[in-house]
Amino acid sequence: MLSHSIVTHPGARPTRACLVLHGILGSKTNWRTLARRFAAARPEWAFVLVDLREHGASQGLHPPHTLDAAAGDLAGLAAALDLPVRGVLGHSFGAKVALRFAADHPALSHLVVVDANPGARPDRRGSEASLAALDTLDAIGAEWPTREAFLAAVMAAGHDRGMAAWLAMNLEHASAGFRLRVDVAAVRSLLDGYFQADLWSVVEAAPAGRRTTLILGGASGVMDAPELARLDAVAARGGCEVVVVPGAGHWVHVDAPDATVAAVVAALAPVSAR
């Protein structure tokens, strides 16, 4: 089963669960602070922070490492939880996994996509930083005497300290110091699936009774003008809601946490409140 942790508001008795999915090379801890704020505002929800396959503590899962497999992992997790999964929120790669999961679960009442393109992206536009990070991890090796040595190597490859610190979250203690716990080849395979999958149908033909919300960074490049127009057309006929966070880049929740919390809290309102 996927590694996960559950966030609820103290004293609350939630009646449903929302899966929270990180982006590529992330982990379940990425959304912990914001999840506490979500739970405070929506105590009826439990927020299940997930380590997707080959990320965080969810290592060693059987291949193939595909988008379908990642969504299947979620189905297994959902079946094991005490609360019914009625919502799923994902950022970037995690959002694409959320869309794939939603395609197979019509009873899902809430779908929140954070800065991800529902369509295929053969040009890999907007994910340059993640691709560069994978190239760096391939180039610098997996074992390090100290965390600082790893940080220095990542920065020497052209990344800033913030990116280096983020990548260092994938280090674990080893006999000789630290080692990278992720299988870079497996992560590349997952990312290939992310770019290849076209899941516009999940947004454009959502089942009745589902609230779909897309939260986009105003300064992000994951969607071009025609794709934004296509999304606006879906929103105009009531098929989804679109929230653009001005000035925020791809990591919307990092650049604008307050705006992200407000958007997610609104997105998780009862469907009858539309």
Give the residues covered by each predicted segment:
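Active-site loop/oxyanion-hole signature of alpha/beta-hydrolase fold enzymes
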Residues: 5, 9, 32-89, 93, ...
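The conserved beta1-alpha1 loop
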Residues: 19-23, 216
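Active-site glycine-rich loops that stabilize anionic/oxyanionic intermediates
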Residues: 23-26, 92
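Alpha/beta-hydrolase active-site loop signature
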Residues: 25, 52-56, 118, 249-252
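Flexible "cap/lid" loop of the alpha/beta hydrolase fold
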Residues: 99-103, 108-144, 224
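Conserved alpha/beta-hydrolase catalytic His-Asp/Glu region
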Residues: 142-195
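Conserved serine/cysteine hydrolase catalytic core
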Residues: 175-235, 241-244
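Catalytic histidine-centered segment of alpha/beta-hydrolase-like enzymes
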Residues: 245-257, 261
